[in-house]
Amino acid sequence: MIALIAALCGAAVGGASWYRARAEGPAALLKHLPRSGALILYVDFAALRRAGILGAIQAPAATEDPEYRDFVRRTDFNYGRDLDTALAAFTPAGRFLLLRGRFDWGSLRSYAQSEKGECRNTLCRMQGSTADRQISFFPLQSNLMALAISQDDSAAVRLQESVEGSMPEIPDAPVWFSIPPELLRSGGLPEGVQPFARSLENAESVVLSLAPEGKQVAARMNVRCRTNKDAAELTSELSKATALLRTVIEQEHRAPNPADLSGVLASGAFLSADARVMGYWRIEQAFFDNLLSEARR
C-alpha cells in the first residue's frame, strides 16, 4: 500500500498555484473523485508519522526504486516527509488522486518539462510508463495536488468538479479502503483472499480500515448487506472460511504465521448486527516487514 502510493507520487509532478480554499477533510474531497465501481483508498500519512508507524513500514532509501530516488533528488519531494494525506480512486478509466502535503511547485514543474512533458498555465502533462498512462496534474490549492493517470492527458482537470452519486462510509482510521462489489466478483484479488471475497460478492458495500492498536494494527471490516438475513448468512460463511483455514494450517502441523497473509486471515472474528457485518483481524509488525522484504526483491 505504501509502495503503491509512493510509486504514484513518484510518477506525478506538479504545476503552480491555482486557487486557495480552506482545507477539506476526506468526505469533502471524496465528492470530487469518480466513485461508481471505484476502489477508493485513503491514507493519512501525517497520522502514521505521528504514531511512529510510517517509519517502521517505509522502505529504506537504499532499497527504493531508482527512478523515485531521482525524483526526490530533483524535486525535493519525499512522500514519507512531505505527503500528509492521499485520497485515490482506482477505476477502469484510470487512477485519480487528491494529494495533500508540501510541494515545491517550481521544482515539480521543471521536472515535468525536463521529462518531455508540458505545462500550460497551471496544468502539467507528461507521458507515463506506457502510451495509455497519460499523467496530468495541477494544484487545486497550494498544498493540494489533483493528479490523474489515464488515457486522457487532461483528466486531472475533472477533479475540480463535484461528482454525483452515493458516498462510501468513512471510518475513523488513518487508512481505509472502500471496495466495490464489481471488484469482488471479478476474481482479481489475491488468491489467498478469494474464499472471503466470494462470500462478499452480494454485499451492498464493503469498507476495510486499518488503525494502530497497541503494538499491533487492527484491521476492521464494515459490510452493509441487503437484509438482516443476508448479514447473518455472511457472518456464518466468513466464520466457516476462517475456521477452515485454521484447520488446514493445523493439518500441515504448523502454527498461523503472523508474517504472512494466511496468518492474518486466520485471526479473523465476525459478528452481525441487523444488516451489518463487522470483521476484525490482528496484524503484527512482522507482516509489514515481510511485505517490504518481498517488495525489495
Predicted regions and their residues:
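Hydrophobic membrane-insertion alpha-helices, especially the h-region
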Residues: 1-15
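Long, low-complexity, Ser/Thr/Gly/Pro-rich intrinsically disordered segments that act as flexible linkers
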Residues: 17-118, 212-214
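Envelope-exposed proteins and targeting segments
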Residues: 35-39, 93-95, 141-143, 217-219, ...
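One face of beta-strands
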Residues: 39-41, 97-101, 204-208, 215-223, ...
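Short hydrophobic-aromatic micro-motifs
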Residues: 39-43, 97-98, 136-139, 143-149, ...
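An internal, short helix-loop-strand segment that often contains or flanks glycine-aspartate motifs
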Residues: 51-53, 59-80, 118-220, 224, ...
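Short amphipathic alpha-helices in soluble, non-transmembrane regions
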Residues: 109-117, 234-239, 294-295
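A cross-kingdom marker for long, charged
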Residues: 252-297
